[in-house]
C-alpha cells in the first residue's frame, strides 16, 4: 500500500492511498463467485458461467464497485494509521482510478484532530455554589415531604381554600355553545395545582360544597386546541365536596410509618441527615469537577476547532437521546409528533452543549497524553466488570461489544479528569 498525506489548511487535508492487486485479485474471485450464482445465460447452467465468458459478456469492470466497497473500509483505516492521522469526522472518499491489473488509487478528504495547547490544569482554584453542609431545615423539609405523602383528604365544612381539593361537575361553553372536552363530572381538582387553565381554580376559592359557580376564563393564545385558543369561556361549576389535607402528627409513630427500619423520629432525622450528606457530597464533587474542567478548557488553546467535530457530537447526542426514547416505546416520529418539534430543533438545542463537550474532551485527552496515562490489563478487566454489573450483562458480552482501544482511551481519560479534579481547591 502506498500512502501520502497533503495538508490543505489547518486540520484538513487529502489522504491518498492505493489498494494493491494482492488484495484486489482474491476479492474479484469472491465477488465473481457470488454474482455468478444469479446469472442466467443461454447455453450455461445457472451458477456455472465461466469467468472468461463473464468478462467477455459484461466486462471485469462490472465487478469493480462491489470489490472496492468491500476493500475500502479496511484500506482506509490502514492508510489513516500509516499516515499517523487522528481523523475526527467522516471522510469524503473519491476513487481516482480502477485500472485493470493496476493498483487502485483512492483519495479521502479528511478532517484531523486539532492541536491543543494546554494551559494550567493542575492546582486550579475554583468557585462552586454547592456545599456539603446539611442544615436542620433540609432534614425537616425531607421529613415534611414524606409526612405529606402520608396525608389523607378529609371532608371539610365551609369554604374552600388554596391547597384544598374540590369535587366538581362542570360544563364549559363559548358564546352559549358547549364545546368538546369542556364537560366533566365528579372531577377532583386541587386548588393551586395548575391542572386547569389559568384563572379557573382561583375562582373556586372561598366557595363551599353545594354552591354553583360561574367561572369565566380565557384560553391561552398557545392552547393546544387551536379552535379554543384565545377565546373566552364560561364554565358552570357545581361543587359537591370540599376536602382538606390532613397530615399525621409529627411523632415516633409517623417515623415508623415512613421508614420501618427506624423506631423514633430522632432516628429518622439521623438517617435522613446521613442520606442528604451522601447526596450533597456527590453533588459537591460533581460541581468541583465541572468547574475545574471548565477552567482547564479556558486555560487551553484549541487551534481552530473543526465544525465537523461539533456536528458529530450533536448527532451522537441526538441518537443517544432518541435511542433512550425508543427504549421507552416512543419512536423518533412519535416523539417529534408529540412535542411538535423536528430533528433540526433538537440539533439547535444540543449544539451549544456539543461545542462545550467537544472542547472538554479534547483538553482532557491532551492532559492524558501529556501525563502519559495508560491503562493496565487489570484496569481494563475491572472496567469491563464494572460495566457488566452496571448494565446487568455478562462480562464476556461486554468484552465483545467494546474494543480494547476504546477501553484504554476511556480509562486514560478518567485518570486525566481525576488529576484535574483532585488537585483543584475550592475558593
UniProtKB/Swiss-Prot annotation:
Domain annotation PPIase FKBP-type: ranges: 163-248
Keyword Chaperone: yes
Coiled coil: none
Gene Ontology terms: biological process: 'de novo' cotranslational protein folding; cell division; chaperone-mediated protein folding; protein transport; protein unfolding
Main subcellular location of this protein, as a coarse class: cytoplasm
GO molecular function, one term: ribosome binding
GO cellular component annotations of the record: cytoplasm
Keyword annotations: Cell cycle, Cell division, Chaperone, Cytoplasm, Isomerase, Rotamase
Location in or out of the cell: Cytoplasm
Gene3D superfamilies associated with the record: 3.10.50.40, Trigger factor ribosome-binding domain, Trigger factor, C-terminal domain
UniProt cross-references to InterPro entries, sorted A to Z: PPIase_dom_sf, PPIase_FKBP_dom, Trig_fac, Trigger_fac_C, Trigger_fac_C_sf, Trigger_fac_ribosome-bd_bac, Trigger_fac_ribosome-bd_sf, Trigger_fact/SurA_dom_sf
EC number: 5.2.1.8
S-S bridge residues: none
Catalytic activity: [protein]-peptidylproline (omega=180) = [protein]-peptidylproline (omega=0)
SUPFAM superfamilies: FKBP-like, Triger factor/SurA peptide-binding domain-like, Trigger factor ribosome-binding domain
Enzyme class: isomerase
Record carries keyword Cell division: yes
Function: Involved in protein export. Acts as a chaperone by maintaining the newly synthesized protein in an open conformation. Functions as a peptidyl-prolyl cis-trans isomerase.
UniProt comment concerning the protein's domains: Consists of 3 domains; the N-terminus binds the ribosome, the middle domain has PPIase activity, while the C-terminus has intrinsic chaperone activity on its own.
Protein family (similarity comment): Belongs to the FKBP-type PPIase family. Tig subfamily.
Entries under PANTHER family matching the protein: TRIGGER FACTOR CHAPERONE AND PEPTIDYL-PROLYL CIS/TRANS ISOMERASE, TRIGGER FACTOR-LIKE PROTEIN TIG, CHLOROPLASTIC
Protein name, entry field: Trigger factor
Origin species: Streptococcus suis (strain 05ZYH33)
Organism classification: Bacteria, Bacillati, Bacillota, Bacilli, Lactobacillales
Gene: tig
